[in-house]
Amino acid sequence: MKNRSLALSQSILVLHGPNLNLLGVREPQHYGRDTLDDINRRLTQQAKAAGFSLSALQSNAEHILIERIHQCLDDGTAFILINPAAFTHTSVALRDALAAVKVPFIEVHLSNVHAREPFRQHSYFSDLALGVICGLGAHGYELALAHAMRHLSAQA
């Protein structure tokens, strides 16, 4: 990394939408056996090893996710990884919050949404996202984080 002290000042936010607190239990054929704690622990270690700070929030409530996105205007969040889960297909409000704060983000989905029910194939976020990763299970989060850190390092 070019400037480790700059990276340390850069914070990455991971947002997990509804029902992701049930990972490891809910439909493992689609979402895998990793728990949300497993995923967050690996992401925190990956970010720390590269000199970045990372925070994560899971909520089943749309307004809590929106309020956390709004906080990015004041807290120095440099990048967002978001798995909007079911809000992917329904939440214009969450989309508007991401558009308003202008923090780059990657949309992550554990399952391949394009191989599932038709209603899961529409996203209100993809056209705003720097990228979209789906169908790679929990590893998709790690790939998204690696790209976020590379993106932030290139901006330095």
UniProtKB/Swiss-Prot annotation:
Locate the site labelled Transition state stabilizer: 26
Sequence positions that bind substrate: 83, 89, 96, 110-111, 120
Pathway assignment reads: Metabolic intermediate biosynthesis; chorismate biosynthesis; chorismate from D-erythrose 4-phosphate and phosphoenolpyruvate: step 3/7
Domain of life, per UniProt, equals Bacteria
A Pfam family that this protein carries is DHquinase_II
Q: What is its EC number?
A: 4.2.1.10
UniProt catalytic activity: 3-dehydroquinate = 3-dehydroshikimate + H2O
Q: Does the keyword Protein biosynthesis apply?
A: no
Q: How does it assemble?
A: Homododecamer.
Give the protein family.
Belongs to the type-II 3-dehydroquinase family.
Q: What is this protein called?
A: 3-dehydroquinate dehydratase
Corresponding gene?
A: aroQ
